[in-house]
């Protein structure tokens, strides 16, 4: 859950187009830089360098609210409440899923499913469920039923935000470049045998 006491300090610096969202942390024990970044992009934040620091080791969950408020004050633009709500839910869900599959895999999985939902305008429970299964398979991640339900609930919210896919991927370019280049192991095997089959077909044709 999001902390009720904000012990962290946050700074947000507006950067030029193409910079993306970059987050650095200090004395934050629960939320990773990637978790913050993914959630902030969902909120609509773009081209900003963000620093989150604690006076000692703290979870850092309450800092997300502070970053969004600082961004609003810096740009003079109000972030819609439903975007804030989805971003907060994303941070919580990613953290909870990370407890079972690790932070790196949780960040990649949530980002990949989010891209599918936004890119294909997925909204029905069955479509979102299929997207979750496909992403988990591609990334070779085993999910518990509980984590599937949490991600499903999050994506239900995200599907109503009308996210801009190009903005989504450009603000975390390094992450989405990795995801774009990652195929599931079975896909790689299938592609390998397909290439062998094509070579043999050409050889004997």
Q: Which functions belong to the PLM regions below?
A:
Residues 41-141:
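Soluble oligomerization/assembly scaffold segments of membrane-associated complexes
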Residues 8-14, 70-82, 99-112, 146-154, ...:
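Short, Lys/Arg-enriched charge-dense amphipathic segments
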Residues 8-10, 33-42, 81, 122-127, ...:
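N-terminal secretory signal sequences
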Residues 19-22, 27, 38, 47, ...:
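Detector for Asparagine
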Residues 125, 129, 138-205:
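Extracytoplasmic/luminal low-complexity segments enriched in Pro/Gly and acidic/polar residues
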């Amino acid at each position: 859950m999001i902390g009720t006491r904000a012990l962290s300090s946050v700074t947000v610096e507006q950067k030029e187009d193409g910079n993306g969202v970059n987050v650095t942390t200090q004395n934050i024990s629960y939320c990773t830089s990637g978790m913050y970044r993914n959630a902030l992009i969902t909120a609509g934040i773009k081209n900003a360098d963000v620093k989150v620091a604690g006076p000692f080791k703290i979870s850092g969950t309450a800092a997300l609210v502070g970053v969004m408020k600082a961004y609003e004050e810096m740009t003079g633009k109000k972030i819609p409440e439903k975007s804030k709500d989805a971003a907060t839910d994303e941070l919580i869900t990613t953290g909870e899923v990370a407890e079972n599959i690790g932070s790196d895999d949780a960040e990649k999985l949530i980002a990949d499913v989010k891209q599918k939902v936004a890119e294909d305008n997925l909204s029905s429970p069955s479509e979102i469920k299929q997207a979750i299964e496909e992403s988990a398979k591609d990334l070779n991640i085993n999910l518990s039923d509980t984590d599937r339900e949490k991600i499903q609930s999050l994506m239900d919210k995200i599907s109503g935000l009308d996210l801009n896919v190009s903005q989504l991927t450009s603000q975390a370019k390094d992450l989405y470049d990795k995801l774009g280049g990652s195929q599931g192991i079975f896909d790689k095997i299938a592609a390998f045998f397909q290439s062998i089959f094509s070579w043999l077909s050409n050889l004997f044709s």
